[in-house]
A protein has these predicted regions:
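Hydrophobic alpha-helical membrane segments
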Residues: 1-313
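C-terminal active-site rim and adjoining tail of enzyme catalytic domains
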Residues: 214, 467-558
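Membrane-interface segments at or immediately adjacent to transmembrane helices
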Residues: 301-375, 379-383, 400-404
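Structural preference for beta-strand elements that scaffold enzyme active sites
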Residues: 312-314, 342-344, 411-413, 442-444, ...
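Conserved, mostly hydrophobic/aromatic
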Residues: 316, 335, 346, 381, ...
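A cross-domain feature marking catalytic cores of carbohydrate-active enzymes
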Residues: 317, 345-347, 414-418, 447-449, ...
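Short, acidic/polar
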Residues: 324-334, 398, 426, 431, ...
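Metal-dependent phosphodiesterase/phospholipase catalytic core, i.e.
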Residues: 359-463, 556-557
């Protein structure tokens, strides 16, 4: 604690102002990137960007693909420019030669000298250190960078990729630490990339460096989390003394501010022997930056926490805890007993324009044959034995599945699994055949295909239609009622913006307790999970969270 208070004593406004400015520029930049992505995709009638449609975008929409490449390059350049501002600004503060005009002039000169090379290097640094930055500094713009969660989810799909991913990440971290001086040498000394790599490797090879590194890391952790714990303590006191007042939004905003403050203090700790003075004219700027950051974070928190935790529960693919083969009648019969609000299931169109309940676009994994659902008739598909989760059964046609659900008053969340070859026919045939049934029994439809969704809106009310988004790269569409979002890409801002626009946000598929708690703390409308019984328990516990406990969940998982 002595170190922390000593740091406060020596910490001056200049670094805090600089960190605030960098954070605000990054935050605005991310928002502008979303607007640009939305503009590009809307003009080409492309609903979203994913690995599955990337080839289609490149071939059929080259201008959109070019625009997205340009956007990515601009993102790298912006990241490098902000890093340059930070490095030059801190150096100026240390030498008491700070000047805003000089800072921006020099940073632009460096940007012009290294341009894309500097952007790539900074991007690699950001990718490698992002998990630690997320954990230590709860700044608004970092909370919207969900790449860490996406990568973690991807490599966790099986033990081999998990172990391999962890080993690769450890190697990446080691080299990033060894080369941490590359950017400062390039920015401050105009070093070439080769010279900077050699110098950084030489400096970081000694035992004294690693000793200082671990000591600095411990200090940074203590500084950052001591502040967060103080804010949590204030919330605990507020829960006790002022239970009628909801101060969650205020403390959520304080988290954002403290994330920026602790970042500045952490940098200052490395130079405690130097008196850092406040550059002239920064008091008004600092006040404005604090006000803007606090207001934006407060607004997000206010929207997030203004409703109780009571999400719709949805059983993913009709199973609970692997109690059967997904998307089959046998599993439906078992899972209904757990009383989910909805059972999510998937539908493919067959060769004879009928519908089979099935998720995969290839039958190899479930049935052991190399065929697609649209290549076979419904009768042929129903003869297949499918195996999963140590269970074996037959595939179920959609009519039978739907009839059983209606008889037991079980609402369905139906995913329409279209392909590029059948999307239009699929939507028209499905809507004509099942529109009345879906409306009468309050079922919901969702799909990854935007054009399918637009066609369905001609026959089915928007309130029964949801749009699935694997990645959160655009701003909400006005004509979409609800979004299904991959839980690893959920961010507080995305949930808040949609709630402000009176749009619903579902999330899929959090299965661990930690992932479920993240979704609950952000106040999503519905949760799609493979473990609906665990979800019920988690919701009951979350409904008894104090405001401090909910704030802690947001702190840990956002």
């Amino acid at each position: 604690m002595v170190v922390i208070f000593h740091s406060f004593k020596n910490f001056k406004h200049g670094i805090f102002t600089l960190c605030l400015l960098i954070n605000l520029i990054a935050w605005i930049g991310l928002f502008l990137f979303r607007i640009f992505s939305t503009f590009l995709l809307e003009r080409a009638a492309v609903p979203l960007i994913s690995f599955t449609n990337m080839t289609n975008i490149i071939i059929k929409h080259p201008f959109v693909a070019t625009g997205l490449v340009i956007e990515f390059i601009v993102f790298l350049l912006l990241t490098f420019w902000l890093a340059t501002i930070a490095i030059i600004g801190f150096k100026m503060l240390l030498t008491e030669s700070f000047n805003w005009d000089t800072l921006f002039q020099k940073s632009l000169e460096v940007l012009g000298r290294y341009h894309l090379l500097g952007g790539i290097i900074t991007g690699v640094y950001l990718l490698g250190f992002l998990p630690f930055l997320h954990f230590l500094f709860k700044t608004p713009w970092l909370s919207n960078l969900t790449l860490t969660s996406m990568v973690t989810e991807f490599v966790s799909r099986n033990p081999f990729s998990l172990v391999g991913g962890q080993l690769l990440y450890i190697c990446l971290l080691y080299f990033l630490i060894r080369f941490y001086l590359v950017l400062p040498l390039m920015v401050l000394e105009n070093s070439s990339i080769i010279a900077a790599l050699k110098m950084s490797w030489q400096v970081t090879r000694t035992k004294s460096f690693w000793k200082k590194f671990w000591l600095a890391l411990i200090k940074v952790f203590l500084i950052a989390w001591s502040g967060y714990l103080v804010i949590l303590l204030l919330q605990v006191i507020a829960d006790w003394i002022l239970p009628a007042y909801n101060l969650l939004a205020i403390n959520y905003a304080l988290f954002s501010l403290w994330g920026i403050v602790s970042l500045g203090i952490s940098i200052t700790l490395a130079y405690t022997e130097v008196q850092i003075t406040n550059p002239r004219g920064t008091f008004l700027l600092e006040f404005l930056l604090i006000a803007i950051t606090f207001t934006l974070s407060f607004a997000t928190g206010k929207v997030l926490f203004n409703q109780p935790i009571n999400p719709v529960t949805i059983a993913h693919r009709g199973v609970n805890q692997k109690n059967g083969v997904p998307n089959t009648l046998e599993s439906l019969k078992k899972t209904i007993k757990y009383h989910p609000d909805y059972i999510e299931m998937d539908v493919h169109m067959t060769k004879d324009n009928k519908f089979i309940v099935l998720h995969d676009n290839n039958l190899k994994k479930l049935a052991g044959i190399k065929a697609h659902p649209e290549d076979l008739t419904l009768a042929e598909l129903k003869k297949l034995n499918v195996t999963a989760n140590n269970h074996q059964t037959k595939l179920t046609d959609f009519d039978t599945y739907l009839k059983y659900a209606n008889q037991h008053h079980q609402k369905l969340l139906i995913e329409l699994k279209t392909t590029p070859n059948n999307a239009t026919d699929f939507a028209n045939i499905f809507a004509k055949r099942y529109c009345a049934n879906i409306i009468e029994n309050h079922h919901q439809l969702h799909t990854l295909d935007f054009q399918t969704l637009m066609i369905l809106q001609n026959d089915i009310p928007k309130g029964n239609l949801n749009y699935l988004m694997p990645y959160n790269l655009t701003i909400p569409e006005e004509n979409i009622h609800a979004y299904g979002m991959r839980y690893s890409t959920l961010s507080p801002d995305f949930v808040a913006i949609n709630r402000q626009k009176h749009k619903l946000v579902y999330t899929w598929t959090p299965n661990s307790r930690l992932a479920i708690n993240k979704a609950l703390s952000l106040g999503v409308y519905g949760i799609v999970t493979d473990n609906v019984s665990q979800l019920h328990v988690a919701i009951k516990e979350a409904q008894h969270w104090s405001d401090a406990e909910r704030l802690l969940q947001v702190l840990l998982y956002s």
